[in-house]
Amino acid sequence: NADAQIATGSNNSSRYFDYYFKDIPHIIRRNRSSVAIISGDESRDELLELGKDIFTYFGLGCRSVTKVYIPEDYDITVLLEALEDFKELSNHNKYANNIDYQRSVYLMNRVVFLDNVASLFRENSEISSPVGVVFYEKYSELNVVREELVKRKEDIQCIVTNEKGFYDSVLPGQAQSPELWDYADGID
């Protein structure tokens, strides 16, 4: 018998944990990812810092950025070219296999995507992307993005941005370096 339980798993397994541990105090961790918001005014150095937030630990983990919001008129090649500095990741066999697999699936299904060797970029409204893929979504107003992220708060670990007014936000390059008091899911 235990006084409390802590469990981690997928969104699906968390449903079972919630049921199984319903009568005792518990903390259940679910799938989460991090997102970034680009204003279009970022320097190359800031984009490289964002690259650390995307590619550190091969994009695995709740603090890894799996989705980037970009302005409607943003030239995404600026981001892609900056992130080419991480192309050495494609020399890692298992990471490269993920990119090759996703590229094959996208080509066979005629899905539009961009490729900068380090990763594939696909326009998609989902938060979590497969390993080797970064989703992006265009926005016209930051307030709309802000509202969307509040609605999806349960799916988001942190937000990487220079913009003000976003909950749990960190500057580019800081997603993988939480403070001691940055509790996962906000639970101590």
Region roles according to the model:
Residues 2-15:
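Active-site phosphate-binding strand-loop segment of PLP-dependent enzymes
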Residues 5, 38, 71, 145-146:
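Short low-polarity hydrophobic stretches
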Residues 9, 40, 51, 59-61, ...:
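Residue-identity detector for glycine
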Residues 14-130, 138-139:
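ALDH superfamily catalytic-core signature
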